[in-house]
Amino acid sequence: MYILENKNQPTPIEETTFADLNMLERDIEEMLRLNIDMLCETDEESMLIVGQQVRNEQNGRSDLTAIDNSGNIVLIEVKRDVNDIANRKEPFEFQAIRYAASCATLKSTSELVQNLFAPYVEKHRSEFTKEQNLTATEIATRKLDEFIKQCNITEFNEHQKIVLVASGFDEQTISAVAWLNSNKVDISCYQIFPYRLNDEILIYIKKIIPI
């Protein structure tokens, strides 16, 4: 990759790794939490983060949970690189499927607020300074209602979506996700690449499945 400073002088951009940048999985997760539009492919798409590190019935933790502009619950699982995927006790995609199954039981926006969004707001209370006189439940309800109105959402959680994010994927994950897609499971893989340009770090995100 190059940056074109003038017509005849392209400057190469150095590809690096999150490990070389001393960035951990939680750092990537936090970057996406605060900038979730990085995973939206078009201007028409949008997501609202409603949960982080949410525990399911098996005591597992999902990285990020969102609602999209169609009212679907989106489970976002993050791994730093292929090594992190390989070192897991269970396949990357199976972990996300279990979390999606637990979110499928949410039948109303009030359940979403009570079980996920209000605890998330409480955890990140410092980010909601304009609503400091409201309870976490009141803030979550207001933010969710605003998002639903803005996106003209008429259905809630009719479908669940899974998004896997990593700087690289192993063949097992790629094959499994491709098969799940062919069997109508809404699951996507996004590859995230860090680049270094002088003292700046550039991030490039590419959807690799489905194409």
Regions found by a protein language model. Name each.
Residues 1-211:
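Charged, terminal alpha-helix-loop-beta segments
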